[in-house]
From Swiss-Prot:
Part of the 30S ribosomal subunit. It comes from Borrelia turicatae (strain 91E135). GO terms for cellular component: ribonucleoprotein complex; ribosome. One of its GO terms (biological process) is translation. This is Small ribosomal subunit protein uS10.
């Protein structure tokens, strides 16, 4: 039997370490409530590259490149309870992690 009660939690961050720590804290909170969990599933890293001139006046060939990497994780929670939702909303996550919760 397939149930339609599912919560999808997506995590975004520029730092992999705090992203994995946040995912583990969410997994521990879900395991305490005895709900089924799928994940954390690593999603493809989005890389934005910026090229700028090193000198404002001359040396067009001299350039510098910067990149910004956005790491993502996906966690599916099957058959969530209202107590689990309250604990997820009250969960303290480090700064720099964006959380997107959808049903």
């Amino acid at each position: 039997m397939i149930t339609k009660d599912k919560i999808r939690v997506r995590l975004f961050s520029f730092d992999v370490k705090i992203l994995d720590q946040s995912a583990e804290s969410i997994v521990r909170a879900v395991q305490k409530s005895k709900a089924q969990i799928k994940g954390p599933i690593p999603l493809p890293t989005k890389i934005k590259k910026y090229t700028v001139l090193r000198s404002p006046h001359v040396n067009k060939k001299s350039r510098e490149q910067f990149e910004m990497r956005t790491h993502k994780r996906l966690i599916d929670i099957l058959e969530p309870t209202s107590a689990l939702m309250d604990s997820l909303m009250k969960l303290e996550l480090p700064a720099g992690v964006e959380v997107d919760i959808k049903q």
